[in-house]
């Protein structure tokens, strides 16, 4: 089961709602996953379509409990192994579909004319409880969230730009920073930051999924920190090894060209130590001297040795 399905299954458990909350959730679901249709005799019907049976059952229950609409759930079998079955909740004309659609904000009536309403109805977001339930409904109807092990991405998909922009504004009232983009004929409201996705899951009441995502975030952060430390240590080790190889090459050149005994005593001591202990750090080399010399002092002497070797190379040319 995908992480997105887990989230939706979790939030479908909220079935004990007030009438206003039920209207807000149905509005969220129906405005993004519903289709308005007409029969041959021009009688209106409305279908909610979903691949998740839990969403179909929730829609069925909310319609029955709060509107006394006893509809049915139809299953459209998929012939493809890769595709899921489609679950349809169909509300016919004789079930009072027109009044229902006006109440949930799918339709609006102005000057005797009934038209589709592409806005976020004010009634659905007038208080915090309804606003949260409405966002939850939109997520159930047209939302998805990626596997947090791979990437952080949560989105809502709708076919109407005005609705997408208004929904983004509603989401952002919680201090989030959702953005809207067009994807072919759809408009997508999305969040890409892990912390903001956690906040959104909290808003819609997906607390178990929130904890799972937080655990993934913590583990990923720990892995990233370990990788950074390993990379840093590897880089430092590589620099140390390269420097030691370069220093030994310079010392051997001096030994061949003029002999180490020609070096000042303080440089000769360090040169011999470096030859005898090629894997030791500068700090460890310094501690072998009597009296001990600090890391910067050893580094300074080795630089002087390398400078002498460089001058010998130039003379050799």
Curated annotation (Swiss-Prot):
Any coiled-coil regions, as ranges: none
Alphabetical list of Pfam families matching this protein: HTH_WhiA, LAGLIDADG_WhiA, WhiA_N
Annotated InterPro entries: Homing_endonucl, Intein_endonuc_central, Sporu_reg_WhiA_N_dom, Sporulation_regulator_WhiA, Sporulation_regulator_WhiA_C, WhiA_LAGLIDADG_dom
Keyword Secreted: no
Keywords, sorted A to Z: Cell cycle, Cell division, DNA-binding
Record-annotated DNA-binding residue ranges: 281-314
Keyword DNA-binding in record: yes
Highest taxon, organism lineage: Bacteria
Gene Ontology molecular function terms on file: DNA binding; endonuclease activity
GO biological process entries: cell division; regulation of sporulation
Family recorded in the similarity comment: Belongs to the WhiA family.
Physiological role: Involved in cell division and chromosome segregation.
Protein name as annotated: Probable cell division protein WhiA
High-level lineage: Bacteria, Bacillati, Bacillota, Clostridia, Eubacteriales
